[in-house]
């Protein structure tokens, strides 16, 4: 899609499109909660027929929510890291976002379910590895779980 909403597709009911998706580069860096302007853009995309939005740019995980019938994952964090040599621990939390889309007759293109698989990027020996949050231990596990509850709720 172009930057100018006036140039966006007008026909949200186009039956040749099963699911319109957007991957916007948006929001402020290193903020866990989307800015009101970002939320407004999500509503605008939803109003233009986008059914799934997976945002990026904040470098940290952000909430997942429904905007009408549109599923919005505001930010998934960093999969491979940033240019920062010593990134603070909250910026090392990321998520793999899996969305199930129906192919059934009559429901084709609708979101049947989703799940976020949170992970922590841990460094060791000059390399980083992705560790599922449930595999963490000690105080770091408690900190990460508390942060995720603050972002996503229980």
Describe each region flagged by the PLM.
Residues 1-154:
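Acidic, metal/ion-coordinating pockets
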